[in-house]
Amino acid sequence: KKFPNVNLIQGDFKGFGWTKNHAASFATNDWILIIDSDEVVDTELLAELKNKKLDEKIVYKLNFKAFYKDIQVKHCGWNNQKIKRLYNKNITKYNSNDVHEDIITDSLKIEELKGNVEHYSYHTISEFIIKADRYSTLFASNNAGKKSSSPVKAFFNGIYSFFRTYILKQGFRDGYVGLVIAFSHMVTNFYKYIKLYEFNKELKK
């Protein structure tokens, strides 16, 4: 009620790709900027969005700064991620992936905008646990019958994920936050593939 230009739409969640395309169908403007509820556009990006002359044949990507609570995460693979978020809905859309959805860019150019999106993705340890369960289930559901898995594969995917995040991507430089993130990556990847293993077994019955 305080923001008459805002239209709140509620509906079923059918995976990230489908849900974002469904939400875009309600937009009255052709240009779609995807900003999640835990993300904030900084002043530089806001100015860029106001002044930029957009080209419908270009999909625009944004730079992301990640935070845990109010602590900026500068390593772990979270720092300065470039993610496609601005597009013309008459030209393209998101793919239908349940998780790891992305804007389709066939024959389109990609350009990065100035400024940043500040992503306050987690505020408690419990949120890591909840998201690990949710994302691993979506991954397993989306890949059941398409990808193979086994307990051994799940184990080594988890171990490598920790090593990659904490050592190769220097998560140790983020202090205890880096350890939390690396362990969360390990758990998420283990559950992704062990759930996929169970889903595939169910399909064979």
Model segments located where?
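Catalytic metal- and UDP-sugar-binding loop of GT-A-like glycosyltransferases, i.e.
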Residues: 11, 35-37
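Catalytic-site signature of metal-activated, phosphate-bearing donor transferases
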Residues: 18-24, 31, 35, 42-202
